[in-house]
């Protein structure tokens, strides 16, 4: 795996094998029995899946050394965001749906909404 030492690769592979065994130990329930019995089996299966998912997250985070909480993505303030069509302006409507051309009328509507 790119950028990793061989030793951590083997640790990661062991962790992935362990997680695979956890998931294989909880097969989907068989569709037999009364409706209520099937519903109860599925409910218990989903609860076990949630536990396995939590265990898998803990195993991977300890193996990879990453934090439990996701790192928040820093976004620029909305006032600084704008639509720039300087590259694509001048192309006709035959370019298709993906065209980023903005008409003067819609640009005025966008401008009036941001001045409030």
From Swiss-Prot:
* PTM comment, free text: Asymmetrically arginine dimethylated at one site by host PRMT6. Methylation impairs the RNA-binding activity and export of viral RNA from the nucleus to the cytoplasm.
Q: Which GO molecular function entries does the Swiss-Prot or TrEMBL record give?
A: DNA-binding transcription factor activity; RNA binding
Annotated GO biological processes are: mRNA transport; viral process
Renumbered to this chain, region (Disordered) spans 27-47, 87-116
Relay the record's extra comment: HIV-1 lineages are divided in three main groups, M (for Major), O (for Outlier), and N (for New, or Non-M, Non-O). The vast majority of strains found worldwide belong to the group M. Group O seems to be endemic to and largely confined to Cameroon and neighboring countries in West Central Africa, where these viruses represent a small minority of HIV-1 strains. The group N is represented by a limited number of isolates from Cameroonian persons. The group M is further subdivided in 9 clades or subtypes (A to D, F to H, J and K).
Annotated domain remarks: The RNA-binding motif binds to the RRE, a 240 bp stem-and-loop structure present in incompletely spliced viral pre-mRNAs. This region also contains the NLS which mediates nuclear localization via KPNB1 binding and, when the N-terminal sequence is present, nucleolar targeting. These overlapping functions prevent Rev bound to RRE from undesirable return to the nucleus. When Rev binds the RRE, the NLS becomes masked while the NES remains accessible. The leucine-rich NES mediates binding to human XPO1.
Protein name as it appears in the record: Protein Rev
Query: What is the scientific name of the source organism?
Result: Human immunodeficiency virus type 1 group M subtype F1 (isolate VI850) (HIV-1)
């Amino acid at each position: 795996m790119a950028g990793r030492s061989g030793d951590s690769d083997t640790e990661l592979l062991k962790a992935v094998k362990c997680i695979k065994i956890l998931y294989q130990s909880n097969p989907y329930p068989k569709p037999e029995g009364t409706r209520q019995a099937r519903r109860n089996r599925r409910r218990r299966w989903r609860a076990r899946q949630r536990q396995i998912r939590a265990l898998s997250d803990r195993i991977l985070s300890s193996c990879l050394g990453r934090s439990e909480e996701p790192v928040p993505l820093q976004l620029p303030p909305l006032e600084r965001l704008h639509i720039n069509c300087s590259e694509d302006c001048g192309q006709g409507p035959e370019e298709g749906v993906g065209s980023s051309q903005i008409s003067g009328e819609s640009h005025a509507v966008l401008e009036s909404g941001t001045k409030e």
